[in-house]
Regions:
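Patatin-like phospholipase
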Residues: 1-70, 80-317
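Gly/Ala-rich beta-loop-alpha elbow adjacent to hydrolase catalytic centers
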Residues: 71, 75
Length: 317
């Protein structure tokens, strides 16, 4: 019997944002009057799930037809690889940083548990392609520490400037050391305000946004446990600017983002018709944000890839 092959679904079978992207790929043109954005959730090494989804989109020839790619926190790094058309290099970076040089809880109290310096050293061995002609724009989200405002850094067109902006977006309060300087201002992790880049792309002119999730659609941060809350508040009280307030508000903010996306998935709520998310089914094993385990990262990449292929393709004999 002939083996089954995969083909892209008919756009009429897809949510509007995915349908618009598939139609562009079919036409080999962006001249449709739409402005299509991809938003990549971060979450430390949990971004492996979104990486797998992006690999599938690239494999299907879709990412080159986006107008802009946004990322938050570790999603900003993945966004750089996706925008440049080298998501496979991003996958290898995630595998290569699964070492104690990157995440080491034995450093608690002495130095940052997470070494962004080590991560960027690994990235420089496989640098993302920034600013290539014909590729989507790259934009990343970060929080300005002194006033707690979420800002878009970009479009980013130069390699070292892009890595500096990505470092700012990935500056995880408490875990990765102090907030970082970018173009004369101090920034921290964009995920404090917008973990899943959707609202900002829409505000900046996107007609549709495709959100790649690092966690399943039902995931919620909920209320922090008492012991965790006490420890985090103790450390956060020493942080500059608005960081303490933002850390305290983050669980509720994240959960509202997730609820809005869940509604959009069924075409309702404020994002209905304009936003579609790709997210693993509830119960899919997820990578913890500081879980530097190569096997878990590979499994999450494979799971994310399967999610995207399942959503966008059909098997035919």
């Amino acid at each position: 019997m002939p083996s089954a092959v995969s083909s892209l679904r008919d756009p009429d079978e897809l949510p509007a944002p995915l349908a618009a992207l598939v139609r562009r790929a079919d036409a080999c043109s962006r001249a449709d009057g739409e402005h299509l954005a991809l938003g990549i959730e971060g979450g430390g090494l949990a971004v492996a799930m979104a990486c797998g989804m992006a690999l599938a989109l690239e494999q299907l020839g879709l990412t080159q037809w986006l107008d802009v790619v946004y990322g938050t926190s570790s999603g900003s790094l993945m966004a750089a690889y996706v925008a440049g058309g080298a998501t496979g290099d991003g996958e290898r970076v995630l595998e290569d940083v699964c070492t104690r040089e990157f995440v080491d809880f034995r450093r608690i109290g002495r130095s940052p548990v997470v070494s962004i310096d080590h991560l960027l050293a690994v990235v420089r061995r496989r640098p993302p392609r920034i600013g290539d002609a014909g590729r989507p724009q790259l934009r990343v989200l970060a929080v300005r520490v002194d006033d707690g405002r979420l800002l878009t850094l970009g479009p980013l067109t130069e390699a070292e400037d892009a890595l500096a902006a990505i470092r700012a977006s990935m500056a995880i309060p408490v875990w990765s050391g102090p907030a970082v300087a970018y173009r004369g201002e101090i920034y921290s992790d964009g995920g404090l305000i917008e973990s899943i880049p959707v609202r900002t792309p829409l505000a900046e002119g996107a007609s549709h946004v495709i959100a790649l999730r690092s966690r399943d659609g039902a995931y919620r941060k909920g209320r922090r446990g008492r012991a965790y809350r006490t420890a985090e508040n103790l450390v956060a009280s020493r942080l500059p600017g608005e960081l303490r307030r933002l850390i305290g508000e983050r669980p509720a903010r994240y959960d509202q983002e997730a609820r809005n996306l869940e509604s959009a998935t069924v075409g309702t709520g404020p994002l209905g018709g304009r936003v579609a998310q790709l997210a693993p089914p509830t119960g899919t094993p997820l990578v913890g944000r500081l879980q530097a385990d190569r096997d878990h990262v590979r499994a999450a990449v494979a799971a994310g890839r399967a999610v995207a292929l399942g959503a966008l393709t059909r098997r035919t004999a």
